[in-house]
Amino acid sequence: MTYKKLYSSTIFNRELELSQDYNTNSTAFQYDFLSDDFDLNRDSSNFKMPTSLFKNLRDDKPIIFYMNPPYGTTGKLAKDGTAKKIDISKINLFMKANHYGNASQQLYAQFVTRVIKLADDFDLTNVYLAMFSGIRYLAGGNYWLKFDQHFFKQFTYKYGMIFNAGEFSGTSSMWPIGFTIYKLNKNENNIPKEFELSIMTRTDSSINNVGTKTVNLVEKDSLSSWLRNPAITGTPMPDGSYPKLTSAMKESKRNNSRCTFYEGSMGCLMNSANNVAEGTTNGGVWLATSGIYHDHGVNVFDKNFDKVVADFAIRRSIAPTWVNAQDNFTKPNTNSPIYSSFIGDATVFSLFDTASNQASYRNWNGYTNCNKPGRWINQWFFIDQGKIETEAMRKKQNDVAYDAYGDKNRYVYLKLQNMTLSKEAQNVLDLATKLYFKQLKYRKKAILKYPDMSLNAWDIGWYQMKLIDRVFPSKVMQELKSAIIILKEKIAREYAQDLIEK
C-alpha cells in the first residue's frame, strides 16, 4: 500500500530498521513518543520530530495515529513483593498531575494520552486513532474509570475487533488483543456504556469473523465491589509482628506490607482486579493465613467469610479462554435457593485449590496470632482437634500430639458442622481427612525432611499436606485431587459461569 505521507517512529533503532524495510517510502525517525517534544505546540521552533511532520500538525492536516504500544506498567510487583522498574515518562507524570487515575501506570494508556495531548496542543480537528492493545480499558471498572472519562470525552468509538494474542510472535495465546478505531470528537458528552467487538479467528487460508462480543465500560454489580463492601477492618497488627506472605511459606522482600493485617483476622484473600484471567492464569487470587505483600488483600473475618470463599471459588473455578479472559464477574444472588449449597461447596474448595496457601506456623520469628509466641494457628483447618490428639498419641507422633494438647477446634471445622454439604464437597472433605490420618504416621520423618515447614503443627494446611505427599506419596492424594477437580467443575458449571458479565 502506498501512502501520501507516512511517518514511522520508535524508540529502538532495530525496530526502526525493520520499519524502513517494510515501508521504504516512509519517513522513519527514532523518537520517544512518551517524552520527546513534550511541550510542543504550533508556535514551537525547536523540535525533534521531522520538520514536515511538525508542519502537518501545525497546519491541521488529517492524521491517523496507528499504534501497537507495549503492554506493561511502571510499577508492577513481582510475586516476591519486589517491583521491576520501567522508566517514568513525562506523559506518566502528566497523567498523574491531570487525574488520569490508576491507569497512569499502564504504558498503552500513556501512548493514547500523548495522542490526546498532541490533539489539544495543536488544536487538531481531523484525527483518527487506530491501535492494537489490550482491552482492559474497555472493561476495567474503577481502575480505568478516570482514564476512560478523559479519553471518551475526546474520541468516539468507530470499530473494534479482538483476536488471539498468540497471533503475535512470542505472546501468550490465553488472552485477547483488540484492534480499535476512534475518531476525534472533542467535548463528546455521550460516553458509551458498552462496546461491540468482532471476534476474529485465522485459519491457514482465511481470516474469519466468528461472532461479536459485548464489553461493558462500567461494571454491573461487580463481584469485587460486593466482596469489599462494606469494608471490614479492626485494630492493625504492628509491622513486624506477622508474616507478610508471597505464598504459603515465603515472606515478602519488601519492608512494608501493602495490605494492613488486623487483629483477629483469619488471613487474607489476594483479590486482584475482577476478570477471569487475573483470577486463574495471572495468579491474582489466592488465600493465606496471614498478611500478604499486595495492596489487593482482603482480611478474613467471620462477618465476611462467606463472601471471601464465594469470591475465591467463583474466580478460581472458571477455565479462561482467550475470548473470556478479560470478562468481569458480577456478584452472586444471595437470595437464590442454591446460594447456601454454593457456600458449602466454596468453603471446602477454598481449602484445597492450588491457590489455597493456608498454613500453620511454629517458631517462625516469634509470630503469633493466639497470644502464644511462636504459634500461628490455621483457622482454616477442617478436622476435630480431639481426634487428632488421640490418633497422634496412638501412632506415637509426639510432636503433633504435644502441639494439639489443650488446643481447641478451628473456625472452619466448627463452621462445617453446621453445613449440609453436596456429595461432591463431602467427598473432597472425606478424602482429605483420610489423607491427613494416613500421613500422620510419617510426620516424624517429614519433620526431619522439612525442618522449617512447621510440620509439627496439628492444624497444617493444604500446602503442608502436599509437602508430605512429595516424600510419602499416597493413592489417596490422587483420589483427592480428582475429587477436587470434580468439585471445581461443579462450581464453574452451576454457579460461576452465570456470573460472567454478559
Across the structure, where does each feature detected by a protein language model lie?
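Conserved proline-anchored active-site loop of SAM-dependent methyltransferases
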Residues: M1, D32-S35, S44-K90, Y108, ...
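A short acidic (Asp/Glu
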Residues: E17-Q20, L40, G75-A78, A139-F147, ...
